[in-house]
């Protein structure tokens, strides 16, 4: 017998869910504050940071990324809107003086940086285009080599907020004229891409140089190695290549006396979902609320008879959290395919006849029944997040219990959103305060609280 997450309270005269006060088992202190509202929590990026195409569904088809390429004194910017088959790009270029404030201690916590590095033609730009721009893998064959540092702001939800910096392979950023310390100081993760179908000895040498220099500047960087383009290798060759690269890279670090540096290795390809799964694991390490999200998912599935649950960012198909059960690649691929189908159909048929309205709200769901008695169940959590569950048909007969437990889960997620939003606003407000120097009248040092 499944345990219900919370007890329903008496409803008001309108019987709406907004007047329900539920308790989530094991999570004390989750109470609606005076500033809590779905409108605020679903607002996504702050005002002035996002734009939305008027014909797209409000809940799902929102701004995915802001892409900027750096030249001295010039930022070229384009906005990418929508997802799935509804992706549209509004390109605009502007010339302006732009200066990055790397000294702001709060900016690195609010939006960490992910660096994409590697040799030329290793596939860095293709990864970025496929994951965050929904480019078809076959179209990446026509991409030109990157000849400048490109920065991309990813602001899909309150949890998925980071910057991706794509470094050209031919740039020697350790040149004396290049301030690499400024780059590494605010970096959360460094992804080094190695072409598995090419001779990777030079790539391993560059990897060692990059990791050792970056670690001296910032010991908190997560070092991730993408062994890329493995789609052309046999299964045995994939395993052998990963083992060889893993062994050589760690031996080089051991010879330099840097055994404490940890490298994570992933086999990736843009022609399957492996690149999305690898990016999911990279992004999860940058989410401070990950333990809370995983705990919420564990409580939810254990009390609802659900086999597996993912919390997806629907724009990029990166899952920001899952329960403690192992992740199966086929399960993840089914979730990604379901999101594509649901979003593409919604962009076509979800709007009203006049093209207005919001076809998705907090009650929107999608159900797909498979031939193996498994049900895929999708529920919208926020404008950018969706919960995708795997449920057996016999367990799905208790859909009322699942929906009620989901209501408790969604409410707890919104509470986590609210805490993060308040923290971000507080840090931004502190960063704008003028720094006080000198001493107080009694001669003691002045401390800014």
Swiss-Prot record:
Claim: Nucleus is one of the keywords in the record: yes
Record field: catalytic activity: GTP + H2O = GDP + phosphate + H(+)
EC number: 3.6.5.-
Subcellular localization, as worded in the UniProt entry: Cytoplasm; Nucleus; Lysosome membrane
Start-end of Acidic residues biased regions: 14-24, 32-47
Tissue expression summary: Expressed in the distal tubule of the kidney.
Major subcellular site: cytoplasm
Top-level division of the source organism's lineage: Eukaryota
Regulation: The activation of RagD/RRAGD is mediated by a GTPase activating protein (GAP). In high-amino acid conditions, activated by GTPase activating protein FLCN that stimulates RRAGD GTPase activity to turn it into its active GDP-bound form. In response to amino acid depletion, the GATOR1 complex inactivates RagC/RRAGC by securing the GTP-bound inactive form.
Record's keyword terms, sorted: Cytoplasm, GTP-binding, Hydrolase, Lysosome, Membrane, Nucleotide-binding, Nucleus
CDD domains per record: RagC_like (cd11385)
Any one of the GO CC terms: lysosome
Cystines in this chain: none
Family matches, as Pfam families: Gtr1_RagA
First-level EC class: hydrolase
GO MF terms held by the record: GDP binding; GTP binding; GTPase activity; molecular adaptor activity
Binding site for GDP: 121-126, 140, 144, 146, 228-229, 231, 269-270
Residues engaged in binding GTP: 120-126, 140, 146, 169, 228-229, 231, 270
Family note: Belongs to the GTR/RAG GTP-binding protein family.
Protein role: Guanine nucleotide-binding protein that plays a crucial role in the cellular response to amino acid availability through regulation of the mTORC1 signaling cascade. Forms heterodimeric Rag complexes with RagA/RRAGA or RagB/RRAGB and cycles between an inactive GTP-bound and an active GDP-bound form: RagD/RRAGD is in its active form when GDP-bound RagD/RRAGD forms a complex with GTP-bound RagA/RRAGA (or RagB/RRAGB) and in an inactive form when GTP-bound RagD/RRAGD heterodimerizes with GDP-bound RagA/RRAGA (or RagB/RRAGB).
Name of protein: Ras-related GTP-binding protein D
Taxonomic classification: Eukaryota, Metazoa, Chordata, Craniata, Vertebrata
Gene (UniProt): Rragd
